[in-house]
């Protein structure tokens, strides 16, 4: 279990769900992870549902933007990366070949953010914190534990994020298919990059939540109306599973060693 009051630039710091049915998602995740969910008015009639464990924020549930819903885009978990200057980082991302879908904007007094699509096609968010630093609890059951990019171009993706965020990438010895472990500029492990699987799958950042009972959590996903896409899988140092909530959002579960 690790409490957080700040994040080093380049670190994954928050995740939220864009969904077509907030109330159904609230019921699913509160039962699955024991989240305590608080409805927060976010302007223009929008409710941002903040999820907590033991009084510490861990994630949120938000309504899917109308344009995505009308285009038939499935619900998805978003990955936020803390930066010092979101305006400068968004400009740099564009220079490196990314698409800035939402230029930097203020989120009330919580922070300032931008929505980016990397050159290979994966979406992510840049976050400059004000009153909301991000998750107050990580690497604990029900909390964010890892972020993993599935990409059709490992080298291209690694170079983009190195140039944008100062990350380092290290090939995991003996991994087949290849796997790059990502670290922030100060040397902390921060995620991974792997080939998109199966081939042809659109690139995306997969969000992992920790669990202390993987088999039990997988069973609960199914009992609550979700789908188990990949059951208990031994990856050597941990066990993982990939699942889908009843509205269609994909996320992963992790059971293994957790850093402080």
Functional labels for PLM-detected ranges:
Residues 55-63, 188-193:
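Short, flexible domain-boundary/linker segments around small modular repeats
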Residues 2, 36, 47, 65-67:
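Short secondary-structure capping/turn segments at boundaries of alpha-helices and beta-strands
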Residues 7-9, 13-56, 95, 101-111, ...:
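Core segments of cupin and vicinal oxygen chelate
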Residues 1-8, 11-20, 49-51, 66-92, 94-145, 149, ...:
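Vicinal oxygen chelate
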Residues 41-42, 53-54, 61-70:
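Conserved donor-binding loop and adjoining core beta-sheet/short helix segment
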Residues 57, 67, 132, 187-188, ...:
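Active-site/binding-pocket entry motifs
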């Amino acid at each position: 279990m690790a409490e957080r009051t700040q994040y080093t630039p380049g670190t994954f710091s928050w995740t939220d769900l864009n969904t077509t049915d907030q109330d159904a998602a609230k019921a699913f995740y509160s039962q699955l992870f024991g989240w305590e969910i608080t409805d927060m008015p976010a302007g223009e009639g929008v409710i941002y549902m903040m999820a907590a464990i033991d009084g510490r924020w861990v994630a949120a549930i938000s309504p899917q933007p109308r344009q995505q819903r009308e285009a038939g885009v499935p619900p998805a978990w978003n990955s936020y990366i803390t930066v010092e200057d979101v305006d400068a980082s968004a400009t740099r991302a564009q220079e490196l070949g990314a698409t800035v879908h939402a230029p930097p904007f203020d989120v009330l007094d919580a922070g300032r953010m931008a929505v980016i699509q990397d050159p290979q096609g994966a979406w992510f968010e840049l976050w400059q914190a004000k009153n909301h630093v991000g998750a107050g609890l990580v690497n604990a059951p029900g909390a964010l534990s890892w972020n993993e990019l599935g990409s059709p171009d490992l080298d291209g993706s690694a170079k983009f994020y190195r140039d944008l965020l100062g990350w380092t990438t290290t090939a995991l010895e003996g991994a087949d298919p290849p796997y790059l472990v990502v670290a922030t500029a100060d040397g902390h492990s921060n995620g991974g990059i792997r080939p998109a699987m199966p081939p042809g799958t659109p690139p995306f950042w997969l969000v992992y939540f920790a669990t202390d009972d993987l088999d039990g959590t997988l069973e609960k996903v199914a009992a609550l109306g979700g789908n188990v896409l990949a059951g208990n899988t031994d990856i050597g140092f941990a066990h993982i599973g990939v699942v889908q909530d009843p509205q269609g959002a994909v996320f992963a579960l992790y059971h293994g060693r957790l850093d402080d």
